[in-house]
């Protein structure tokens, strides 16, 4: 029969590109699990009372090319003015060698958070370099491997200051009045839930206030003034006040390190080290503190350790501080941070080196001096005598200046009384400065830049002598070697090949949804129309962004069954926090602010209790029954016990045990009965889309991990996006923003992120995914994710018991393999299996979560049958190896499992093991072998001998 034009157009072509198994393979797998069709399998697994009759209507699928053309037209509505707004965001020049070989390279952006250090040494080294940059520039002892943005880093600094403060009865936090307004906004939001009083005043008056546990100063104020806070910090320290300083990476190249002035904590944004503004993000924040406070620091910290052979190796250090272990007692709720962006900043520093960075910083400052000199020569007054890159210029006719700026397609900062702000950056040229003269002076001015340059070069006093840096920075060889593009390209490749990412193998991490990040989805993030917009530009310049965000929000509303979506939270953990704040403020609006009990199942992800604590709630744990489901009797008892103060429940669906709980609606009803709200964690949304939805189930609010379900890549540990969907009654209580008031924003509540739409520049990834999949494709993706998980479970269940199943012995989109019986019988642990999988070319599944002694496997819909079979074959081969240990063929203390992973150097070393070299390194054959570069790490050594800065090059050789 002749095909129709519609069939030939094949608008759903991307669906087959995204979903791994083709129709024939799907049928083979369905036969293996005993189901007739995807719909039949879904019908068996998902409780009937929550199944949607039809998929949410988000439109038909579009081809990659059609979707890209459509989004390009939308992006074209954005106006790319030259922005001198500043406020922590500047234009940058991302070196093309980093753009092509890292940002656009799936070997970097598809990797996962480096919990498995043996397959993560490349990005761990890049992150260690980032920490070294932070240490050198801040003058402190300990640095983290990035936080979400500068404003949330400020909030973390406040929380940390309280943790380490010796003034236990003090409950006030002082903020200098010239911090960035978005920073103050987020600090106030966080302080409210912690019960802190925030004092905002001129820094000179910090000593006038009593009962202050911490002070936040900004080295270069929001309107540009450089402050020498040495004396103030000394006096504050004498009073045992914890001092935090917000700083700027580029300014710190020239300015005195705040740590040398006595600051306890220094933080800021690393955005201007090569990361585009992107209408607000994603960007990495840096965070450093004194050594004595290291165990109270938030976020990931990369440390130097040893592997089993005694070689230098890197790992995430001191994880016992973090949410996945300490839960509500964690220092922070951070899970995803900003690894990809931190690594861009790290490599930017490596590529330019100290000499290049000083040249860039000095050029920015020179152009600022030239601009200042010319304006003053023509009679304009500067509000501050000391500055680095930002001028606050007093103008008589501000409206006329702003009109001339708009006509010249220039954005100036306009929210300063009787003045405008101008921040220059590394993209600024002498031609730009000449144009700024025209805008500010109103026509012909007769100023000569060459003449002005000679004048300021001889007599620049805009940086106080006391504030000039007097020590060397970035002296480590890594920052002084890779300055040609050839060397830089090879260095980045050498790092990349140490790691295991999705471009090499499946990453079957349960609860992480490591699905395809398609090239067509990634292309728009580097379009200048999206990448170059300042987050505080006039709304009419961002109409393309607003259209894209509005469409994406509308699709997410339909897919979740909620009434509204807020895009501000820039990670899943931030989404949890924002959702819980919405619940808190809702109760307060009903004069029920006393409701502060958050029920959390024992199986919950560690971010849940950590977020509840941050939102000012008390955690009450609800038991799970022997099948892994929420114990309804225990839930009822605790809901009734705390009825007067019940705020909410946080529940994940499908559960973290990998099953669709039959009683989920009853759970919602019980909580609602006693006055609580239902927070449904969106971590497992990949098993809901098109099949059911949180709103349909009965939940009130959820966050969505766009970096899981909706294809934003994990980036080796960030970026992420965690927008929240809410029912109508919670919509007035989602985060707002103090700087930008955009029509259509839902609320005027405080902010949780620095930018109004969080990490806006990665939202096109999720837009593209939904647009190319369409309603039917999205449902099919969920169904194949379920099929793939059940196929693995059915083929492995005889070798490794599946811990929890639902009806008919089925699982949802992931399954938990119970290793405990094997360990008891043979001594081989889940850790041994995880490390042995590296020899077979796989990243390990999730270890010991949510149950100790288990492996949780989530294959996603993107993996084809061949890759699933390869993984299954590896797991079965490992089981056969365990049997060899059990039979005594290999001793427990010397076998391929306990010695895994094996590295190349072992092949040429003396071999004393009872198994062959071939068994060690080629258990799955020699084709496309992944070689780890270190053996199993010594975690105890790493934490007992904490070292978090760059090691000598010889240690890597």
From Swiss-Prot:
It is an enzyme of class 1 (oxidoreductase). InterPro entries: GcvP (IPR003437), GDC-P_C (IPR049316), GDC-P_N (IPR049315), GDC_P (IPR020581), PyrdxlP-dep_Trfase (IPR015424), PyrdxlP-dep_Trfase_major (IPR015421), PyrdxlP-dep_Trfase_small (IPR015422). One of its GO terms (cellular component) is cytosol. GO terms for molecular function: glycine binding; glycine dehydrogenase (decarboxylating) activity; pyridoxal phosphate binding. Pfam families: GcvP2_C (PF21478), GDC-P (PF02347). The modification N6-(pyridoxal phosphate)lysine is found at residue 708. SUPFAM superfamilies: PLP-dependent transferases. Keywords: Oxidoreductase, Pyridoxal phosphate. Its EC number is 1.4.4.2. Its cofactor is pyridoxal 5'-phosphate. The keyword Cell membrane does not apply. It catalyses: N(6)-[(R)-lipoyl]-L-lysyl-[glycine-cleavage complex H protein] + glycine + H(+) = N(6)-[(R)-S(8)-aminomethyldihydrolipoyl]-L-lysyl-[glycine-cleavage complex H protein] + CO2. CDD domains: GDC-P. One of its GO terms (biological process) is glycine decarboxylation via glycine cleavage system. HAMAP family: GcvP. Belongs to the GcvP family. The glycine cleavage system is composed of four proteins: P, T, L and H. The glycine cleavage system catalyzes the degradation of glycine. The P protein binds the alpha-amino group of glycine through its pyridoxal phosphate cofactor; CO(2) is released and the remaining methylamine moiety is then transferred to the lipoamide cofactor of the H protein. NCBIfam families: gcvP, PRK04366.1. This is Glycine dehydrogenase (decarboxylating). It comes from Salmonella heidelberg (strain SL476).
């Amino acid at each position: 029969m002749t095909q129709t034009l519609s069939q030939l157009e094949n608008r759903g072509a991307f669906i087959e590109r995204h979903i791994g198994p083709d129709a024939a393979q799907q049928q083979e797998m369905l036969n293996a699990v005993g189901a007739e069709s995807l719909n039949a399998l879904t019908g068996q697994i998902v409780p009937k009372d929550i199944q949607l009759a039809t998929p949410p209507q988000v439109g038909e699928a579009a081809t990659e090319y059609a979707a890209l053309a459509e989004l390009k037209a939308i992006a074209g509505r954005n106006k790319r003015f030259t922005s001198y707004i500043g406020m922590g965001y500047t234009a940058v020049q991302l070196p093309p060698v980093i753009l092509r070989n890292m940002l656009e390279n799936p070997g970097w952006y598809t990797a996962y958070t480096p919990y498995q250090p043996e397959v993560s040494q490349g990005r761990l080294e890049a992150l260690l370099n980032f920490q070294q940059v932070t240490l050198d520039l801040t003058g402190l002892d300990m640095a983290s491997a990035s936080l979400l943005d500068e404003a949330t880093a400020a909030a973390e600094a406040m929380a940390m200051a309280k943790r380490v403060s010796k003034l236990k009865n003090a409950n006030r936090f002082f903020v200098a009045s010239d911090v960035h307004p978005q920073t103050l906004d987020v600090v106030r939001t966080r302080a409210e839930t912690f019960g802190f009083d925030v004092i905002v005043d001129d820094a000179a008056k910090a000593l006038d206030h009593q009962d202050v546990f911490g002070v936040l100063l900004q080295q270069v104020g929001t309107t540009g003034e450089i402050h020498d806070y040495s004396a103030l910090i000394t006096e504050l320290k004498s009073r045992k006040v914890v001092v935090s300083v917000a700083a700027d990476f580029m300014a710190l190249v020239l300015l005195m390190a705040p740590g040398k002035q006595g600051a306890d904590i220094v933080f800021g944004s690393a955005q201007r080290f090569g990361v585009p503004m992107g209408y607000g993000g994603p960007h990495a924040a840096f965070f450093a503190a004194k050594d004595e406070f290291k165990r109270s620091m938030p976020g990931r910290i990369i440390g130097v350790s040893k592997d089993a052979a005694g070689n230098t190796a890197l790992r995430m250090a001191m994880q016992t501080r973090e949410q996945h272990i300490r839960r509500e007692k964690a220092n922070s709720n951070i899970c995803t941070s900003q690894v990809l962006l931190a690594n861009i900043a790290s490599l930017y520093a490596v590529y330019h080196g100290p000499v290049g960075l000083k040249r860039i910083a000095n050029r920015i400052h020179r152009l600022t001096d030239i601009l200042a000199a010319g304006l003053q020569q023509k009679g304009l007054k500067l509000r501050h005598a000391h500055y680095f890159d930002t001028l606050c210029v007093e103008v008589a006719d501000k409206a006329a200046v702003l009109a001339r700026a708009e006509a010249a397609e220039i954005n100036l900062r306009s929210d300063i009384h009787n003045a405008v702000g101008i921040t220059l950056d590394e993209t600024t040229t002498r031609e730009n400065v000449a144009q700024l003269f025209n805008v500010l002076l109103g026509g012909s001015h007769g100023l000569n830049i060459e003449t002005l340059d000679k004048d300021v070069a001889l007599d620049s006093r805009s940086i106080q002598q006391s504030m000039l840096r007097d020590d060397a920075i970035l002296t480590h060889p890594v920052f002084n070697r890779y300055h040609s593009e050839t060397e830089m390209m090879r260095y980045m490749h050498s790092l990349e090949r140490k790691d295991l990412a999705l471009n090499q193998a499946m990453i079957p991490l349960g609860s992480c949804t490591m699905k395809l990040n398609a090239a067509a989805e990634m292309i728009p993030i580097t379009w200048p129309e999206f990448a170059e917009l300042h987050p505080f530009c006039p709304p009419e310049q961002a109409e393309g962004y607003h259209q894209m965000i509005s469409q994406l929000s509308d699709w997410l509303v339909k897919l979740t069954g909620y009434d509204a979506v807020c895009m501000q939270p820039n990670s899943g953990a931030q989404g949890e926090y924002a959702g819980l704040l919405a619940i808190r403020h809702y109760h307060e609006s009903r004069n029920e602010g006393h409701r502060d009990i958050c029920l959390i199942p024992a199986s919950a992800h560690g971010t849940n209790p950590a977020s509840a604590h941050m939102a000012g709630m008390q955690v009450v744990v609800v038991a799970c029954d022997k099948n892994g489901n929420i114990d309804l009797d225990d839930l009822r008892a605790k809901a009734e016990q705390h009825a007067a103060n019940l705020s909410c429940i946080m529940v994940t669906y499908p559960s973290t045990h990998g099953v669709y709980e039959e009683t989920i609606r009853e759970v919602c009803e019980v909580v609602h009965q006693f006055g609580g709200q239902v927070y449904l964690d969106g971590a497992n949304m990949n098993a809901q889309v098109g099949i059911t939805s949180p709103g349909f189930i009965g939940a009130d609010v959820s966050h969505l991990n766009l970096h899981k379900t909706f294809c934003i890549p994990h980036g080796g540990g960030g970026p992420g996006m965690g927008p929240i969907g809410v029912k109508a009654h919670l919509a007035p209580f989602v985060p707002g923003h103090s700087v930008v008031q955009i029509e259509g924003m839902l609320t005027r509540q405080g902010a949780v992120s620095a930018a109004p739409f969080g990490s806006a520049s990665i939202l096109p990834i999720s837009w593209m995914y939904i647009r190319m999949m369409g309603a039917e494709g999205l449902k099919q993706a969920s169904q194949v994710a379920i099929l793939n998980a059940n196929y693995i479970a059915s083929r492995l269940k005889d070798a490794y018991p599946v811990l929890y199943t639902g009806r008919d012995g089925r699982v949802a989109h992931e399954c938990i393999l119970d290793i405990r019986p094997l360990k008891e019988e043979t001594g081989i642990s889940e850790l041994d299996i995880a490390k042995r999988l590296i020899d077979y070319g796989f990243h390990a599944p999730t270890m010991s979560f949510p149950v100790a002694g288990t492996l949780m496997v989530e294959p996603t819909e993107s993996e084809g049958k061949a890759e699933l079979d390869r993984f299954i074959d590896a797991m079965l081969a490992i089981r056969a190896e365990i049997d060899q240990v059990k039979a005594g063929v290999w001793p427990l203390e010397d076998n391929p499992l306990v010695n895994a992973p094996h590295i190349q150097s072992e092949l040429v070393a003396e071999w004393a093991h009872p198994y062959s070299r071939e068994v060690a390194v080629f258990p799955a054959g020699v084709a496309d072998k992944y070689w780890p570069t270190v053996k199993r790490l010594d975690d105890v050594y790493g934490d007992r001998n904490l070292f978090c800065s760059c090691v000598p090059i010889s240690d890597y050789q």
